[in-house]
A protein has these predicted regions:
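Nucleotide/phosphate-binding catalytic cleft detector across ATP-hydrolyzing
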Residues: 1-152, 160-259
């Protein structure tokens, strides 16, 4: 008999859950390939550490964007490798529950099913991310009383009201963690003449990012290259600056919640 597996195939991270073991994979949704041979060099954390550091022959990339697959072959290979790492092959072809954004097309849904099925999965069941988030938070989604869930991921923010076991109303916007990283990169380039990668921007966001009552004004040292000379350069960014960058995106999310 196949075993049940839950897969959260996110824009930024991929997580795999087994009923008897809990979360067995929690890795960045990144894959590194050899551009000459198409060989897979690394996936997950190892590939993430290569972002912005590969030679011209290799490329480290996110094969998902905005919660949907942008490179089917790379996602297929990434899933196969991650599943092989948890040794499910000898158990048989398992049944899988996979999370998807609340507002994607039927074509995009089919791409997720096909990518997972190609790894030897017998059956794939799709669950909308707000439903999975609510269940994970212990919310009774069968209650007649509506509950609102705001799931801020890497590529999308999913907003939904759930009641009686389903979604009453939902909205998905492409303003989330990755958009914040992109805004940090643009800000640093404009103010400090400093080029940084997505990994550095994300680390700064996690370390000192805050909206509202910031409290102590902390700093984070950014390392990158000078836009003009290309030479190594570093600069300190403050939590006040990160807060100013965050405001527009968080305001948009709040507006969508209230609308």
């Amino acid at each position: 008999m196949g075993i049940d597996i839950a897969i959260d195939l996110g824009t930024s991270r991929t997580r795999i859950f087994l009923p008897d073991k809990g979360v067995v994979v929690d890795e960045p949704s990144v894959i590194t390939v050899d551009l000459m041979t198409d060989a897979i060099i690394a996936v997950g954390q190892k590939a993430y550490e290569m972002l912005g550091r590969t030679s011209e022959r290799m490329s480290a990339m996110y094969p998902l964007s905005g919660g949907v697959i942008t490179d089917f072959s790379l996602v297929e290979n990434m899933i196969k490798i991650m599943l092989s790492d948890i040794s499910i092959g000898k158990v048989g072809m398992p049944k899988v529950v996979a999370c998807i954004p609340s507002e994607i097309t039927e074509v995009e849904k089919r791409a997720v099913v096909n990518a997972i099925s190609s790894a030897g999965i017998r059956r794939v069941c799709l669950v909308e991310e707000p439903v999975a988030a609510a269940m994970g938070a212990g919310i009774d989604i069968t209650s007649p009383h509506g509950s609102m869930v705001v799931d801020i991921g890497g590529g999308t923010t999913d907003i939904a009201v759930l009641s009686l076991g389903g979604i009453s109303v939902s909205r998905s916007i492409k303003k989330a963690g990755n958009a914040i990283d992109d805004e940090i990169i643009k800000y640093v380039k404009k103010k400090y003449n400093l080029l940084i990668g997505k990994r550095t921007a994300e680390n700064a966001k996690i370390a000192i990012g805050c909206v509202g009552n910031i409290g102590e004004n902390k700093t984070f040292r950014l390392k990158g290259r000078n836009c003009v000379t290309g030479m190594p350069m570093q600069a300190d960014i403050s939590s006040y600056e990160i807060s100013d960058i965050l405001v527009d995106i968080i305001t948009e999310i709040v507006y969508q919640v209230q609308d």
